Amino acid sequence: MNKNDSRLRRARQTRLKIAELSVARLAVHRTNLHIYAQVFSEDGTKVLASASTAEAEVRKELNGNGGNTAAATLVGKRIAEKAKAAGIEAVAFDRSGFRYHGRVKALADAAREAGLKF
C-alpha cells in the first residue's frame, strides 16, 4: 500500500462517518500547484459551492502562485462566502485523508473566520 492508497483509505472512512451525520460536507483536495474546496449536499449528490486556486479571479489575485498557505486562506474565505450565499451555515470538514496541517489547516481556519461552522 503506497502513500496515495493510504490517503484514499482514510478519506473513504471519513466520508462514511460524515454520511451518517446527514450534513453538508466541505471537501478539500490538495495538489502541488492548487487547492480545491467543494461543498456537497447532505446526500452527496450535488455540489452546492466550489472554490479553488485554479479560478481566474483567484489566480489574478495570487499572481499565479496557488500552492501556498496564503492561497489556501483566500480559497477558504471564498468557499465560506459562496456556501453562505447558497444558504449553508454548517458543514462537516472532509480533509480527504490529507493531514490537518499547512494548507489544509489554513483553508479550514479561513473558512471558520468567514463564518462557516464546523
Curated annotation (Swiss-Prot):
- GO molecular function terms listed in the Swiss-Prot or TrEMBL record: 5S rRNA binding; structural constituent of ribosome
Keyword annotations for this protein? Ribonucleoprotein, Ribosomal protein, RNA-binding, rRNA-binding
Family annotation (CDD domains): Ribosomal_L18_L5e
In which domain of life is the source organism classified? Bacteria
**Entry's Gene Ontology BP terms:** translation
Question: Can you quote a single GO CC term?
Answer: cytosolic large ribosomal subunit
Protein's UniProt keywords contain Transit peptide: no
Which InterPro entries does the annotation name? Ribosomal_uL18_bac-type, Ribosomal_uL18_bac/euk
Please give the Pfam families that the UniProt record associates with this protein: Ribosomal_L18p
**Does the record bear Coiled coil in its keywords?**
no
Per its database record, what is this protein's job? This is one of the proteins that bind and probably mediate the attachment of the 5S RNA into the large ribosomal subunit, where it forms part of the central protuberance.
Q: Which family does it belong to?
A: Belongs to the universal ribosomal protein uL18 family.
Per UniProt, subunit arrangement is: Part of the 50S ribosomal subunit; part of the 5S rRNA/L5/L18/L25 subcomplex. Contacts the 5S and 23S rRNAs.
NCBIfam families assigned = L18_bact
User: Entry's HAMAP family?
Assistant: Ribosomal_uL18_B
**Name of this chain's protein:** Large ribosomal subunit protein uL18
Q: Which gene encodes it?
A: rplR
